[in-house]
Amino acid sequence: MTLKKLNPITPGSRHRVIIDYSKQSKLLKPSTKNAPLKKNTLKIMTTEGRNFHGVITTRHRGGGHKRLYRIIEFNRNKLGVSGKVNNIEYDPNRTANIARIHYQDGSKKYIIHPEGLEKGANIIASAIAPLSIGNSLPLKSIPIGTEIHNIEFHPGKGGQLARSAGTGALVSYKTNSFVTLKLPSGRSRYFDNKCWATIGKVSKAEHKFINLGKAGRSRWLGIRPTVRGSAQNAVDHPHGGGEGKAPIGRIPSTPWGKPALGIKTRHRHKWSERFFKGLKKK
């Protein structure tokens, strides 16, 4: 995939950067003509960032285009059943594309589309599956140096890690019970070797270079404007108030007065810290 910067014909296209699919192989190009699988979609009601009390718990959410949720098979539980990639589709609910799989038993499912998985390719989930892109195996069956995605935290729960566009983890070390993976963040973590993962990294790695070009496209995605703290009143934000433009005048803070910008927010005594013990970030 390559990137394309649009000419500044209009204000909205001045800084617009998109993914150019015109030079890509037809076997890897996502299709927008086919409707999503009816049995694999759900209607989702947006909460506009509010909880059940109506209080805003996540700011800058609201609006957006109406969409159907595609049910993704994160838990590849059709063991030993081969499936064929029928189509590659756009998913409005995630950064990566998705692949429509037609299994030999007649069922149809969606999976996260790995980079390089072509239309017409066959995939399978098995402990003795070949190390081909899109195949799912337990970590104990995956050799060191393999790039993987859709990784389980707990055996049988379904993939929860490395699912966004362009992400992948690397198998770096193996013991009798655990496998060490280098995560997209750069940290290494221990995983139970009975957890399953999918071979390859997620497609659409160029997503991080996309520039929406105008505010309206953010609103289509359900993202509302973010107002700088220094532009607010003192009653609304610790950075607010003052005459004209004023410096922060204190430690950079969140709207609730907690330290911001570079402060670690992960709890040092969280139970899962044991899986990082003795492993340094590289």
Swiss-Prot record:
It is found in: Plastid. GO terms for biological process: mitochondrial translation. It comes from the Eukaryota. Disulfide bonds: none annotated. It holds the Pfam family Ribosomal_L2_C. Its main location: plastid. Residues 230-261 are annotated as: Disordered. GO terms for cellular component: mitochondrial large ribosomal subunit; plastid. GO terms for molecular function: RNA binding; structural constituent of ribosome; transferase activity. InterPro entries: NA-bd_OB-fold (IPR012340), Rib_uL2_dom2 (IPR014722), Ribosomal_uL2 (IPR002171), Ribosomal_uL2_bac/org-type (IPR005880), Ribosomal_uL2_C (IPR022669), Ribosomal_uL2_CS (IPR022671), Ribosomal_uL2_dom3 (IPR014726), Ribosomal_uL2_RNA-bd_dom (IPR022666). Signal peptide: none annotated. Keywords: Plastid, Ribonucleoprotein, Ribosomal protein. PROSITE patterns: RIBOSOMAL_L2 (PS00467). Part of the 50S ribosomal subunit. Belongs to the universal ribosomal protein uL2 family. This is Large ribosomal subunit protein uL2c. It comes from Helicosporidium sp. subsp. Simulium jonesii. The gene is rpl2.
